Each structure stands twice: as C-alpha cells, then as structure tokens.
UniProtKB/Swiss-Prot annotation:
This is Histone H4. The gene is hhf1. It comes from Schizosaccharomyces pombe (strain 972 / ATCC 24843) (Fission yeast). Belongs to the histone H4 family. The modification N6-acetyl-N6-methyllysine is found at residues 6, 13. Core component of nucleosome. Nucleosomes wrap and compact DNA into chromatin, limiting DNA accessibility to the cellular machineries which require DNA as a template. Histones thereby play a central role in transcription regulation, DNA repair, DNA replication and chromosomal stability. DNA accessibility is regulated via a complex set of post-translational modifications of histones, also called histone code, and nucleosome remodeling. Disulfide bonds: none annotated. GO terms for molecular function: chromatin-protein adaptor activity; DNA binding; protein heterodimerization activity; structural constituent of chromatin. It is found in: Nucleus; Chromosome. Residues 17-21 bind DNA.
Length: 103
C-alpha cells in the first residue's frame, strides 16, 4: 500500500473530497448552437426543435458507456488517472476504432 495515500487500493473507496462541487444538468452545457454546428458539419440544412434534447440524451449515453469502459481499464491497471489509451481501447471495444492517439 505504499505511495497510495489514504485511499488504499480500492479506487472508489478513498477519503471524501472536501470541496467537490455537485455536478447536475451539465448536459445542458452542450448548447443548441453547438449541436447545430455539428449537424451543419454533417450536411444538415434544417433542424427540428425536438432534435436538441434527443441529441443530448444520445450523447450522454454514448459518453457514459465510453467513460465506464475507460475507467474499467484504468482500475484494472491499478491507476487513478484515465489515459488517452484507456479511451482508445474503450472505443475500440465498442467497435469505433480511432487512430492517432497511440495504441
């Protein structure tokens, strides 16, 4: 247990962070213009008003899956820092291989 601080080996079982801001409704940070820009890049001309909430929901689900896998890789390697390779491997596991980030 040397060099691990008071958290021990279990990554999610450390002491509580003292000034941790509670994150709520951050998905609204993906703004309407940001979604519109992504759609424009994909060749979309007009966008229905219902698209924005649906896009946020799908993006949240996608990121939850990628981050869950990346954190699993990190925990398996007994690290506390998620690396770009963890994300690359988690995307590869989901069938979305990307290049240019190592691995």
């Amino acid at each position: 247990m040397s060099g691990r601080g008071k958290g021990g080996k279990g990554l999610g079982k450390g002491g509580a962070k003292r000034h941790r801001k509670i994150l709520r409704d951050n998905i609204q940070g993906i703004t309407k213009p940001a979604i519109r820009r992504l759609a424009r890049r994909g060749g979309v001309k007009r966008i229905s008003a219902l698209v924005y909430e649906e896009t946020r929901a799908v993006l949240k689900l996608f990121l939850e899956n990628v981050i869950r896998d990346a954190v699993t890789y990190t925990e398996h390697a007994k690290r506390k820092t998620v690396t770009s390779l963890d994300v690359v491997y988690s995307l590869k596991r989901q069938g979305r291989t990307i290049y240019g980030f190592g691995g």
